[in-house]
Curated annotation (Swiss-Prot):
Organismal lineage: Bacteria, Pseudomonadati, Thermodesulfobacteriota, Desulfovibrionia, Desulfovibrionales
Listed name of the protein: Large ribosomal subunit protein uL23
GO molecular function: rRNA binding; structural constituent of ribosome
Gene3D superfamilies linked: 3.30.70.330
GO BP terms in the entry: translation
Function text: One of the early assembly proteins it binds 23S rRNA. One of the proteins that surrounds the polypeptide exit tunnel on the outside of the ribosome. Forms the main docking site for trigger factor binding to the ribosome.
């Protein structure tokens, strides 16, 4: 798979902002069939940074109730990337 197909989009939430500032972790939504090795290579290639560790979380699809209606929420795969000391991704700076 091409690196731009593996990394779908960044995750920008309060939790990720706190992790970025304290432990140098950033998060991305990744392709559901990608593995840690592919994600690591894609991040290092696209952003020119050194990756220390990758943690991957799978969110299962589920049905939620909104306004008395059943709504299907699709599942996703999220990768938390720990960067090496001194490394940073310029996209996340200033958020």
């Amino acid at each position: 798979m091409h690196p731009t197909q593996i990394i779908l989009r960044p995750v920008i939430t309060e939790k990720v902002t706190i992790l970025r500032d304290s432990v140098k972790k950033v998060a991305f939504f990744v392709h559901p069939q990608s593995n840690k090795i592919e994600v690591k290579k894609a991040i290092e290639l696209l952003f020119n940074v050194k990756v220390m560790a990758i943690n991957v979380v799978n969110y299962t699809p589920r049905v939620r109730t909104r306004n008395r209606r059943k709504v299907h929420v699709s599942g996703c795969r999220k990768a938390y990337v720990t960067l090496a000391p001194g490394e940073k991704i310029s996209f996340f700076e200033g958020l």
